[in-house]
C-alpha cells in the first residue's frame, strides 16, 4: 500500500501533466503573447465590410496571397480546404480568410471568382492599397511588386505563413507553408478545446 505523501505526489503530478502536455503539444509555431496581429476590417468578396472581431468564438485562420499567384497560393488554399474536410463537423468553428496583397487586381468580383472554388466557406478580403499595407505590416507579412505599374514584375513576392488566432481573437500559431494538414488539424483541435474568452 502506498503512503499518503506518495498518493498526494502522484495526484499532483497527474493534475499537472495534462496542462504541461497541452502547452507543449502544438506542432505549429506557438506565438502566443505577441503584441501584433490585431483585428482589422476589409471588404469581402461579396462586397461587404468584414471585421476579424466578428469571428470571436471561432478559430480564425488567415493567409495572405493573391489570385494571380503562380505558385503557393492555390496549393495553400487547397491545403486549407483539406484541413476543413479533415476537421469534419468541427470545421463549423473554424473560419478561413484569404487576404489579398494585390488589391489593384483583386477586386471583390475577382476574389469571388477565385476563393470559393477552394471552399464555399472561405472569405476573400480586399481593400485600398494603404489598408492592405497596414494589415500586412501588423501581421509582419512582406510583399514586393506592383502589377499596376508596367515596369513592375508580373508576380508579387510575398510571405507564405499561415496565421491562426484562437477563439478569443489572439494570435496563437504560425504554420509554415509545408506544415502537413494532419499537424494543422491537431493544433486547431487543441485551440477548439480551449474555453471561449
Placement of each model-derived feature along the sequence:
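N-terminal export leaders
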Residues: 3-8, 12
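C-terminal motif of bacterial Sec signal peptides marking the signal peptidase cleavage site
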Residues: 16-19
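Bacterial signal peptide processing site
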Residues: 21-23
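A short beta-strand-turn-helix
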Residues: 40-60, 84-87
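Short active-site neighborhood of thiol/selenol oxidoreductases, capturing the structured segment around
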Residues: 53-80
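Hydrophobic beta-strand anchors of alpha/beta hydrolase catalytic cores
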Residues: 61-62, 96, 162
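Structural microenvironment flanking redox-active thiols in thiol-disulfide oxidoreductases
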Residues: 75-135
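Thiol/disulfide oxidoreductase modules built on the thioredoxin-like
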Residues: 131-187
Amino acid at each position: 500500500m502506498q503512503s499518503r505523501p506518495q498518493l498526494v505526489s502522484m495526484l499532483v503530478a497527474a493534475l499537472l501533466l495534462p496542462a504541461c502536455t497541452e502547452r507543449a503539444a502544438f506542432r505549429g509555431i506557438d506565438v502566443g503573447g505577441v503584441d501584433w496581429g490585431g483585428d482589422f476590417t476589409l471588404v469581402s468578396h461579396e462586397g461587404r465590410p468584414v471585421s476579424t472581431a466578428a469571428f470571436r468564438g471561432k478559430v480564425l485562420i488567415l493567409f495572405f496571397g493573391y489570385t494571380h499567384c503562380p505558385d503557393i497560393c492555390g496549393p495553400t488554399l487547397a491545403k486549407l480546404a483539406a484541413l476543413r474536410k479533415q476537421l469534419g463537423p468541427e470545421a463549423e468553428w473554424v473560419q478561413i480568410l484569404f487576404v489579398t496583397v494585390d488589391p489593384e487586381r483583386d477586386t471583390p468580383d475577382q476574389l469571388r471568382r477565385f476563393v470559393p472554388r477552394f471552399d464555399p466557406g472561405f472569405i476573400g478580403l480586399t481593400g485600398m492599397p494603404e489598408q492592405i499595407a497596414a494589415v500586412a505590416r501588423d501581421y509582419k507579412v512582406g510583399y514586393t511588386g506592383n502589377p499596376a505599374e508596367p515596369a513592375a514584375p508580373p508576380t508579387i513576392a510575398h510571405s507564405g505563413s499561415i496565421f491562426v488566432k484562437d477563439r478569443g481573437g489572439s494570435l496563437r500559431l504560425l504554420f509554415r507553408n509545408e506544415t502537413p494538414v494532419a499537424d494543422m488539424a491537431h493544433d486547431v483541435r487543441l485551440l477548439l478545446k480551449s474555453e471561449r474568452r
